A protein has these predicted regions:
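Short, well-ordered coil/turn residues at beta-beta hairpins
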Residues: 341-342, 386, 490-491, 522-523, ...
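A short, basic/flexible loop-to-alpha-helix module at the beginning of a structural domain
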Residues: 1-8, 147-153, 234-254, 365-381, ...
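A Rossmann-like FAD-binding core segment of flavoenzymes
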Residues: 65-106, 300-349, 361-379, 401-509, ...
Length: 915
């Protein structure tokens, strides 16, 4: 056995009344107990009850002191929100693996103040109140929860848009905030991840949008334009970034080489961590490709400059016209770490005959000149762009705005293989750009040193090459010549890394060799990211690399091994098919009037696309289908005074060694939808008995007993006993285990809890008529028969008869018709009620049997855990050292469950003492 495992005398599985009793009995005998509960609080089902029968004592008043004693006992360790993965029997012990699910709240920091709950915008059905009312996604399970710690109910998935973003931005979060009119909060949420929302709102290719579930219907939510709206709204309000003081300074200095999206984002996150950051930029202006090559009509430079203020307002220095040629020099200047984010500022050339003719330029030179005002005069010229990527399309649309008579993009593969994003191609064609496919230039022809013609050859596609695209193959004899005045080569970009080749290792394509997980170079102080590592990518991909690098650089500077940490808090994307199967989805068309008229926009470099109005932004945000349980809007983070919210938490596997195991996993309730003839789930005024217990409990969700359908106070209530028990005809495999197809035994408690509820309803609704439909009344315990007779004396009606079905009246009242056989007369009758309560039976909860890896935990004929010697040693099971308590062994009321727990604790103590 490994020495680093946690060692206990006993493992108690389940934190209901039986589990607590067993744990306390053992703990009081000075045994160390590990209590594992799958819910967020101990208490089990008893804490949901109104009162207990037959004494009608308050259930919470009985169980909450026991909950407090259990939670505070020095010999009891609680593991909540946890599941048993495996239990493996050894010679004199058990090895246990436990999976503790994340709360996304630091349990040792949370004060239970509920501030997170107050600001959380998302409401979900409240399990504690049996889905009769709502609760927030950030919530404390119930008012009497113990421990009183909040939890963020993410349910293990994120929205597809969040999962898809390479930068870790939370589109669902800011969409929901825009929907609520919280534009500043939307901006702040974006700034938690990436500091250049203005640029992304205009020039991001929005991978989030391509994964939007709404896209499977009429069209995706216009996520990028929503971002553009709130970022511009914020920048209009704050034209200059507010200076943010970082109070905790580390004293570490980091040099960032390059001020593109990767460098800016890395500098931003490092500065937030308290490090001193200086960016070295070789160009005259900061911003990298954002500033130098993206056309003004797509991304105005004022937007880039305002984005950069988000970084410099943290104290980050940017030194332009400063080309770094030696990395060792930075170390000698006192920098503790270096981040290389040089981008891809070199271009590939065709290198064919005539390439040196005047009138042939690279795409980057062409776009840079256009951005700095040194624009080529293309008036009435015929322009060709060679290539099919994003820069090729940018160059083609720029050429149109510079007066070109005809602009043609020539690409050697088919349109499907063009690497440019499809919307950009469509916009270019709308403006008049011609796309010529399956052509390749083989010779430039000129006169007097100036380009005049291009010789092309036609291509066909063959088998896929290393890129996964079909290889273009020349067609013999297909050469032809076209007139041209100006050619822009846009056949690819390559990293600007050659200058560092003597100090760091490069791949053959010029990209930097890094640790793929940490972006560290050979375990040194140097890290690299962005296009210099990945090759040409998108803005958001490069920014995501910068964010990742900052995370690992911070670990390195804190003396930690970066390899020991996992970056990011993404969860798997929710299954879209489940979202699309919802019955409340309506169609909502997007806003299509998004562009300036074509004849206007091709004449200048002003914005092509319009910014949403506030009404348009909200309308677009309303189209969101709310895919995941948690919006990840991080309002809880902002509101928490204790800074306890932690979205980076992950599942934790805990190893334990225990000497004995007590199974007190309780029971399941029959799912009444498996008796469809009773209308549960179809008629809102048909509820189950646990829901009624919540309606009459002191901690009930409403101030009165109300029927769910319309909030009316019911005055004619029916109970149908034995719903899902004493019934061999039900296929209820969904509610039970795969082996359980019916539930022929009596659940023992249904009659009495129904009579209890009837008496409480007589007190809460003195004028109500209450009828209990039954086959037999099982009043077997002490005082139970008297309790039954008392209820009859109070006016509760009892009808001995089997209910066949429940239907709803068609008069709009929501009232219900019960069709039943009155066994006293043998006549089939009907009765009207305005609320029907199904007294559901108890089913075995035997899931724990699957967790024993090398032993078989036997079940009895009804699929409860088998008691080997029910009369002499009622807690013994088929595995030595494993004991059963409470309703895990069969139906029991609360007193019997407590007695059973005492028996299990006693037998476990005897077993432990004899080891």
């Amino acid at each position: 056995m490994s020495e680093n495992k946690n060692k206990y005398d006993a493992l108690v599985v389940g934190g209901g009344i039986a589990g607590q009793e067993a744990a306390l009995n053992l703990a009081d005998m000075d045994y160390k107990v590990l209590l594992v509960e799958k819910e967020l609080s101990i208490g089990g089902k008893m804490i949901q009850l109104s009162k207990v029968f037959p004494t009608l004592d308050c259930a919470a008043c009985i169980t909450t002191p026991k909950m407090s004693e259990t939670a505070r006992h020095p010999n009891i360790t609680l593991l909540l929100n946890s599941n048993i993965d495996t239990i493996e029997k050894q010679n004199k012990s058990f090895d246990v693996k436990i999976n503790r699910k994340p709360r996304y709240v630091k349990a040792d920091v949370c004060t239970g103040c509920q501030e997170c709950e107050f600001v959380c915008p998302e409401i979900r059905p409240d399990e504690y109140n049996t889905r009769l009312a709502g609760r927030k996604v950030a919530y404390i399970p119930f008012s009497l929860a113990n421990p009183r710690i909040a939890s963020i109910d993410r349910q293990g998935t994120s929205a597809p848009c969040i999962n898809e973003c390479p930068g870790g931005v939370k589109p669902y979060g800011y969409i929901s905030l825009v929907r609520n009119g919280q534009y500043e909060d939307a901006m702040k949420l974006h700034l938690e991840d990436i500091p250049i929302p203005g640029s992304l709102g205009r020039a991001c290719y929005a991978p989030c949008q391509s994964e939007c579930t709404r896209g499977n219907l009429e069209a995706p939510v216009d996520i990028r334009r929503i971002k553009r709206f709130f970022s511009e709204n914020y920048y209009d309000k704050f034209p200059d970034a507010l200076v943010r003081e970082i109070t905790k300074k580390t004293g570490n200095r980091i040099a960032v080489i390059g001020s593109g999206p990767a460098g800016l984002t890395a500098a931003y996150h490092l500065a937030l961590k308290g490090h001193s950051v200086k960016i070295f930029e070789a160009a005259p202006k900061a911003g990298g490709m954002l500033m130098l090559t993206l056309p003004e009509y797509r991304l105005p430079k004022r937007v880039v400059e305002r984005d950069i203020q988000n970084i410099t307002s943290l104290g980050v220095e940017i030194e332009v016209n400063s080309k770094i040629e030696h990395l060792t020099k930075l170390k000698s200047l006192g920098f503790d770490s270096v981040f290389i984010s040089v981008g891809t500022h070199n271009t590939f050339n065709l290198s064919i005959e005539g390439s040196n003719l005047e009138g042939i330029v690279s795409c980057l030179d062409f776009l840079r000149n256009a951005n700095i005002g040194e624009r080529d005069d293309l008036t009435n010229k015929k322009v060709m762009i060679i290539g099919g990527g994003n820069t090729a399309i940018d160059a083609s649309r720029t050429a149109l705005r510079l007066g070109a008579k005809k602009v043609t993009v020539v690409y050697r593969r088919s349109r499907e293989e063009m690497p440019c994003f499809a919307p950009e191609i469509k916009e270019a064609e709308e403006e008049g750009v011609e796309i010529l496919i399956l052509r390749n230039p083989i010779k430039f022809i000129g006169e007097n040193g100036k380009l005049t013609k291009v010789q092309f050859i036609k291509m066909k596609l063959d088998k896929p090459d290393a890129s996964g695209r079909r290889s273009p193959v020349p067609i013999d004899g297909s050469e032809y010549i076209e007139d041209v005045d100006f050619v822009i080569e846009a056949i690819g970009l390559q990293p600007s890394t050659a200058i560092f080749s003597k100090e760091i290792d490069l791949h053959k394509n010029g990209t930097i060799k890094v640790n793929e997980k940490t972006l560290q170079i050979s375990n040194t102080y140097i890290f690299a990211g962005g296009d210099g590592v990945t090759g040409a990518s998108t803005i958001i991909e490069a920014a995501g690399q910068g964010k990742k690098a900052a995370f690992y650089i911070d670990k390195y500077l804190n003396g930690l091994n970066p390899e020991d940490f996992e970056f990011g808090d993404k969860l798997p994307a929710v299954d879209k098919t489940k979202i699309l199967q919802r019955d409340n989805i309506t169609f909502a068309n997007p806003i299509n009037d998004t562009f300036r008229p074509i004849n206007e926009r091709i004449k200048d470099f002003a914005d092509v696309e319009k910014t949403f109005t506030e009404a348009e932004a909200k309308l677009s945000a309303e189209r969101c289908l709310d895919c995941s349980n948690c919006r990840e809007c991080h309002q809880c983070i902002s509101a928490c005074p204790a800074e306890a919210i932690d979205f980076s938490q992950k599942d934790e596997i805990i190893d334990a060694e225990v000497k004995s195991v007590i199974i007190s996993s309780g029971f399941k309730l029959f799912k009444p939808e498996n008796k469809p003839q009773y209308g549960y789930g179809k008629y809102p005024n048909v509820i189950d008995a646990m829901q009624m217990d919540r309606l009459i409990a002191p901690t009930r969700p409403f101030n009165a007993v109300l029927r769910p359908g319309d909030g009316k106070v019911p005055d004619k209530i029916a109970y149908i006993l034995c719903t899902g028990s004493r019934d061999s005809s039900i296929e209820n495999s969904m509610a039970c285990s795969s082996e359980c197809s019916n539930n022929p035994i009596c659940s023992q408690i249904c009659c009495m809890y129904s009579i209890k509820q009837a008496q409480l309803l007589m007190g809460a609704l003195p004028m109500a008529d209450i009828t209990i439909y039954y086959m037999d009344i099982r009043a077997f315990g002490k005082g139970y028969e008297e309790f039954f007779q008392q209820s009859k004396g109070m006016g509760v009606s009892f009808i001995k008869g089997k209910v066949a079905k429940v239907t709803k009246k068609d008069d709009g009242s929501g009232d219900l018709i019960l069709r039943y056989e009155d066994t006293a007369t043998g006549i089939v009758k009907e009765a009207k009620h305005d609320l029907v309560v199904l007294s559901v039976g108890v089913l075995p909860n035997n899931e724990i049997t699957k967790n024993f890896t090398n032993q078989v935990l036997q079940l009895d004929d009804q699929n409860y855990i088998k008691q080997i010697d029910e009369l002499i040693s009622p807690s013994l099971t088929s595995i030595e050292g494993v004991f059963v308590a409470g309703t895990a062994a069969g139906p029991k009321d609360i007193p019997d469950s407590i007695l059973s727990a005492g028996s299990a604790a006693s037998e476990a103590a005897g077993y432990i003492s004899n080891l």
